[in-house]
């Protein structure tokens, strides 16, 4: 096939199959407008699951549509190396085997000792603060000592201290799952999320169990295991529904319930299910309105602003760039963490890129980079926008774009 772009390939293959844009869209659960934008190379197709559905309907292999998409996501960087990979390899090894085998031997009375809860609590809080600032290498480094200390403390603590230690251990594994997911080490993220669930259940804190399930759903989503991600989120939503609908629900319940509804909205948008995505956003917006303020229960950053930035992300996933940008103009994301602000700006950049507004897309990426350089240099969505902008610009990309591509190790 002579054409070099994805859009041209899709258009030619669609015509060969005798399909209209509307018919192709219906077959893959997307709109006619979405197909038109893809064929005109206005809208990039990033999701392997969507590429697979396109390929199935068009009767070709994914690599025939987009050869580079067949490569593993972790190979996104040209040299196969990710910043902080050595730290995360050590953290991955830490998750291998029993977390505190040495404490299973010896007299139980000898093992019991006083545990410094304030110090452990402060260290877990710091790990999450670093995560919210997208300083993932520092997160990984802190967890290399924190997780073993908490695992030992969970076995050494007095009965009165043990539930809180286990809750802290669950939070530590949750931040590990979050960091692994952002590093696209999703198999390790799943292991960390599973350990977070186990520690939370042992602590007796049901809401911590739900928070652990939320992290597991994030890992499934990144793996493109949409059915498993949806199942994990939906079961948790069902468990919280009665409490969330009560006259005076706990703020923590509303935060988790709303965050899970946002997760369902993103999952639906990723799968091209516009109706379900809108339903999830509406349910989350109702929970946020009842909450009345932005909070950070279980490190979810849930609140009205969080819902608004997710609405932008959902619109981008659905190919509704105009709606995404209209919504983005109404959002003051400064109340969110640097990580959330940067992800919001990446979504704004993606929306501009869908409309081939290269200058605006680059400005959004540079603003995101000023907040959290590590995120922009490693996040696959941000890097995809950089690559698209390089392709838009041809042989003479702007100096700022060339420099950003160099910092992120992105080639056309």
Predicted regions and their residues:
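The alpha-helix within a helix-turn-helix
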Residues: 14, 25, 55
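Short C-terminal boundary/hinge segments that cap the last helix of small helical domains
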Residues: 59-74, 307
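A short, Lys/Arg-rich alpha-helix, primarily the initiator
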Residues: 1-17
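DNA major-groove recognition helix of helix-turn-helix/homeodomain DNA-binding modules
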Residues: 29, 49-64
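Conserved hydrophobic/aromatic packing and binding residues within compact polymer-binding modules
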Residues: 10, 21-25, 35-38, 65
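Short, charged recognition helix plus adjacent turn
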Residues: 67-98
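Conserved binding/catalytic microenvironments
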Residues: 2, 112-412
